């Protein structure tokens, strides 16, 4: 790697919209995110399942299929 052409990599505080803060590394001074592992449905176990069968039935009814 060439010397002097790469940005300085430093430790930064990442702030989530839910209020959670954690430390990471970046070339930016501060990072703000909308969703993190503390509030994401995959990690919290509060997943919302969309019923695909209901959407298919609605489509079939709309176009007179089946």
Swiss-Prot record:
Cofactor binding note of this UniProt entry: Binds 1 zinc ion per subunit.
CC annotations in GO: ribonucleoprotein complex; ribosome
Membrane-spanning segments: none
InterPro entries named among the record's database cross-references: Ribosomal_bL28/bL31-like_sf, Ribosomal_bL31, Ribosomal_bL31_A, Ribosomal_bL31_sf
Keyword Zinc: yes
Annotated keywords: Metal-binding, Ribonucleoprotein, Ribosomal protein, RNA-binding, rRNA-binding, Zinc
PROSITE patterns: RIBOSOMAL_L31
Keyword Metal-binding: yes
Highest rank taxon of the organism: Bacteria
GO MF: metal ion binding; rRNA binding; structural constituent of ribosome
Residues the record lists as binding Zn(2+): 16, 18, 36, 39
A GO BP annotation: translation
Cofactor: Zn(2+)
Function in brief: Binds the 23S rRNA.
Family according to the record: Belongs to the bacterial ribosomal protein bL31 family. Type A subfamily.
Subunit structure: Part of the 50S ribosomal subunit.
Name by which UniProt lists this protein: Large ribosomal subunit protein bL31
Organism: Geobacillus thermodenitrificans (strain NG80-2)
Lineage: Bacteria, Bacillati, Bacillota, Bacilli, Bacillales
